[in-house]
């Protein structure tokens, strides 16, 4: 098996994880050359208890004027208490092209660091992304 070829694409938006004493913090990073008008992050999910599923609604966050290279905190996960939860993040990102709507896959315990959108317009692995012009 040959080694994987180096990635020729550049991420525009990605998630970066930073471990602190009490939690794993997750940041949305603007890797473009432009200031984003706004980045809105929405957390959803659920936990099962016996035969019931209980929905989870996290804080909805909105950041304005997110500069190139800047990361904004979108979530924090507790490595012990959050293990039984299934989380999913969605984003609305306003930029010069229009508004991107981005949805991560649902994951148990936390959301992993990952590329959300590449410079060729393709979404990251297991990510849904669509652009609304305007």
Regions found by a protein language model. Give the residues of each.
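Short, well-ordered beta-strand segments enriched in hydrophobic/aromatic residues
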Residues: 24-30
């Amino acid at each position: 098996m040959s080694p994987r070829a180096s990635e020729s694409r550049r991420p525009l938006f990605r998630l970066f994880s930073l471990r602190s004493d009490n939690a794993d913090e997750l940041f949305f990073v603007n890797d473009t050359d432009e200031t984003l008008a706004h980045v809105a992050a929405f957390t959803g999910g659920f936990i099962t208890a016996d035969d019931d599923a209980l929905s989870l609604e996290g804080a909805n966050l909105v950041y304005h004027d997110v500069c190139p290279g800047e990361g904004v905190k979108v979530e924090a996960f507790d490595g012990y208490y959050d293990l039984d939860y299934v989380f999913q993040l969605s984003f609305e990102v306003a930029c010069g092209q229009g508004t991107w709507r981005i949805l991560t896959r649902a994951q148990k315990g936390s959301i992993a660091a990952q590329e959300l959108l590449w410079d060729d317009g393709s979404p990251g692995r297991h990510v849904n992304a669509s652009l609304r012009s305007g």
